[in-house]
């Protein structure tokens, strides 16, 4: 939901920040995040997210999207749920 958008934006910001990555112990550069590819299917409500199945639902939707788009082999998933 929109309440979790801050988790995603913070993750992207940290992956693009060389200083943060150095503090985290890596010199790997993720480069600029392609924002136009962010959340192409809408929010968890839009894709019929079942309560209590966050990880499984997000993972299965990501695999399905990679298959349907046919353009990529990798995806980044960010979840902030216990």
Predicted regions and their residues:
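Claisen-condensing/thiolase-fold acyl-transfer catalytic domains that form or cleave C-C bonds
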Residues: 1-82
């Amino acid at each position: 939901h929109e309440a979790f958008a801050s988790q995603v934006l913070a993750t992207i910001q940290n992956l693009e920040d060389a200083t943060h990555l150095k503090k985290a112990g890596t010199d790997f550069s993720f480069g600029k995040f392609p924002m136009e590819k962010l959340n192409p299917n809408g929010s968890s409500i839009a894709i019929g997210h079942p309560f209590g199945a966050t990880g499984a639902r997000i993972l299965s939707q990501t695999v399905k999207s990679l298959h349907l788009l046919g353009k990529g082999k990798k995806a980044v998933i960010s979840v902030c749920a216990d």
